[in-house]
Amino acid sequence: MAMESECNVVELIGGFFLKATLLVCQPRTGAIEGDGEEDRTFNISSAADAGVAEAVRAWTAYDGAQELPPLVIEMFLDLRRLGPQHTVVLKDQDGNPWNVCKGGKKSEIMLERWLVELDVGNEEARPEEPPNAAEIYKQLVLLFRYLYTLTQLLPANELYARLHGPSNQGEAAMPLINIGTRILDGSKPILSKGRVGLSRSIIATYTNVINETNVASHLEQKKITPISTGYGSLRITVSYRRDCNFDVNEVLDYEGNNCSSSSVVDTHTKPGVGPLSSLRRVSIHSNRSMSISPQTVYSGTVIPDPSPQRKSSSSRIQPFKAGSVGSGSLAIARNPSGSSAVATLRAQRSGSASISTHVADQAVGEPSSVGSGGSKYSSSFGKIRRQSSMRRSGSLELPAAKQAKPGERGSDELLDFVKMLEEKQELNVKKLYGTTTDISSSLVRFQSMKSNNDTLSEDLSMSYSLEPTHAPQVRYRSNSHSPIPSISPSVQYTSIPMRLSQSRNVSQTELASRKNSAERLKTLISSRTGSFSESRRQSNAGQEDILEDEDDEAEEILLSKSHLSNPTGTRLQSMSPQSLKSISSYNRAAVPFKPVSNFSCPTTMATPAHAKLHKASISSSPDNQSGLVKKDHEHSTMTGGDDDDDLLFFMSDMNLSSQ
């Protein structure tokens, strides 16, 4: 019985190595295909494979006397079908690609490494009564069920399912990359020459991860609970990569027979040949062109073509747009026929054609049109020679770009454009020194005008306050002892010109204007009242002389506003020069001015006539006084009794109080 039990245990150990190899390799590799038979050992089905059985013969032929070496099962990504145009990348958890290698550089990438062994260990640690074959069998059933579950959860299984998914069933039989397995003797050294080993960290972010164990940060390690036997412990350990989302980028170059222009890169994603859905190819089709525009997404790798036959470009590039001139819009439309763009621009702005702009024949851009493609690189830079006559609104019209030489490439145009940008051009910046000087002088002049402006504002306020409040009936006085001619109060004085300064040096132009004004006033009064006496004209002439000497004292007051009344009811006469008071003797409160608003700026108003009353500086003598009384008496006898009424009405409008 003991011998039979030991034979069963030895047989279970051999079956353990075979079943573990089948469960690890079969679900995630297409290389192992069963012949239709199933292996139902340990109550779990698996396809029987003669190749796997032959590979593990050294472990299945265990007789209990020999020492078994560890069994190593490597699972790798086969890259032997890739060419130099392929690039293998690995995407991390965020979807960021990390370059692994180019095709032909490495033959494979290690994904997993399994270690199946019979650990003899220390014989003293073995139990005195080892378990029998039935107990070991039950424990192995649980172990293989756990092993099968673990293989379905590893990242390599997801990669296999993606490569061999239902979406790739219609592709070719052999993909460019595939998952393979290898069975090795663990007692021999394992070389990683020509392949990406398991210890290599592809994603650089794992180098910053703090790891307290001996396992690398980009790897994971799982251990299955060992099963003790009388010959040692059965152990299974696996180390695998955390990330296995590998992809292959391929750039293929196809030349079309019916294409007269050079091929331009057109990138797109395409499933790989065979059942590989993750293979992305960047194909270059000769019958497709590239248009660099905001709507075009450009990605991929461009392989330069040294062939001299493809020198033309089938793309159209418009790197810049010019702004508008005036109120119109500037538009450069694509013109594939190579004709002038003026007609196209005129068609676009059908509503605004009010500008006549003449542009010389010099072209703005130099597009390239090589071969039969007929496409152009149009640029808004170049030498512009314009002769423009612009009206109120319109747009700038640009002529068509001239044709380039047939032998030029599109890249030469771009290089010339970059060189033009790098050239340093002098900027005509206007110096502000003269402008600063002008501003300073303007400020000085403005400050000097402030005092004059204040004086003018005050004078205008006083002039406005002296405006008559009512319009009396027109009456004329006939008797006056004043040397200033009397005028009708019906004339409305909206403003009284006053002096802005107290300088005594009055210009000859101002004196002449005053004389002319006095003459006009005398003419007007003479037409209304009749004729003036010779003594009156002499008095006016004498007053003009006095005006030149004493124009700075009484020029700012119109004494026609003063109110003089005679309480005795006797005949009223105008004031003589001896009875006039200077306006400077009146207090501001004594003069009944109307409240007016302050003027912030000089105000001018048109007036029909101006009257100025000046204080006479001559002293009166008895002879002069008697002469004036005599002349006044003679004049009063000629005009009659109505003169008294006229004089009374005129004097009543003088509103200056006699306080």
Curated annotation (Swiss-Prot):
Q: Which InterPro entries does the annotation name?
A: ATG13, Atg13_N, HORMA_dom_sf
Record carries keyword Cell membrane: no
The UniProt keywords, alphabetically, are: Autophagy, Cytoplasm, Protein transport, Transport
Composition bias (Low complexity) maps to: 364-382
- Nucleus keyword on record: no
The terms under GO molecular function for this entry are:
armadillo repeat domain binding; lipid binding; protein kinase regulator activity
Q: Which residues form a coiled coil?
A: none
Where does the protein principally reside?
A: cytoplasm
Q: Where is the protein found, in the record's own terms?
A: Cytoplasm; Preautophagosomal structure
Q: Which cysteines are joined by disulfide bonds?
A: none
GO cellular component terms given for this protein: Atg1/ULK1 kinase complex; autophagosome; cytosol; PAS complex; phagophore assembly site; vacuole-isolation membrane contact site
Region Disordered: start-end pairs: 260-280, 295-320, 353-409, 525-551, 560-579, 612-644
Q: Where is the composition biased (Polar residues)?
A: 525-542, 562-579, 617-627
Enumerate the Gene Ontology biological process terms. cellular response to nitrogen starvation; Cvt vesicle assembly; mitophagy; piecemeal microautophagy of the nucleus; positive regulation of autophagy; protein localization to phagophore assembly site; protein targeting to vacuole involved in autophagy; regulation of cellular localization
What this protein is reported to do is described as:
Activates the ATG1 kinase in a nutritional condition dependent manner through the TOR pathway, leading to autophagy. Also involved in cytoplasm to vacuole transport (Cvt) and more specifically in Cvt vesicle formation. Seems to play a role in the switching machinery regulating the conversion between the Cvt pathway and autophagy. Finally, ATG13 is also required for glycogen storage during stationary phase.
Family membership:
Belongs to the ATG13 family. Fungi subfamily.
* Assembly, per entry: Interacts with ATG1 to form the ATG1-ATG13 kinase complex.
Could you tell me what this protein is called? Autophagy-related protein 13
In its UniProt entry, the species of origin is given as: Eremothecium gossypii (strain ATCC 10895 / CBS 109.51 / FGSC 9923 / NRRL Y-1056) (Yeast)
Per the record, the gene is ATG13
